[in-house]
Amino acid sequence: FRLSKYREKLIDMITANPTMVQPKERRAMILKQLEDENMDDLCVSRTAFDWGIPMPDGFDKNHVMYVWFDALTNYLSGVNGLDQSDENPLKHFWPADCHIIGKDIIRFHSIYWPAMLMSADLPVPKSSFSHGFVSASDGRKMSKSFGNVIDPHEMLDKYPVDGFRFYLCSEAIYGS
């Protein structure tokens, strides 16, 4: 995938639209990556995995689709976004008003995904907001693989759902 072809256009779009990548610290980080780094083209297949979506017939059978190249398209296919006809009841869901994403995947959502959409001549999401992680008492991010998560179902057995939502929204620091 010719990611390099969209570098300047991405810089121009993000510069012209301050809300395209938020918060401002993440926007600055993405712009710095676009301006300072060599934007290599992106290989859409991988050989290091024995799992994944196979490449179409005619490609090397040892290759599978690069997971991010495939996964990002789910946003569009989930709302039947390629069909912009009046008959598509979901057409008003694309482009997305805002993608809310974790800070560890902002590059994929703020560089790769918009470039993929531009290559297909499709509108890009209006904005992406990158949030931080919920941290455990030791300061590490909460993660199932670390085994330090809180079971939300246990919390809902103790507290009303609206109270729990309010707590999470009011105490979380977006962008941290």
Where is each model-derived feature located?
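Structured secondary-structure scaffolds
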Residues: 1-176
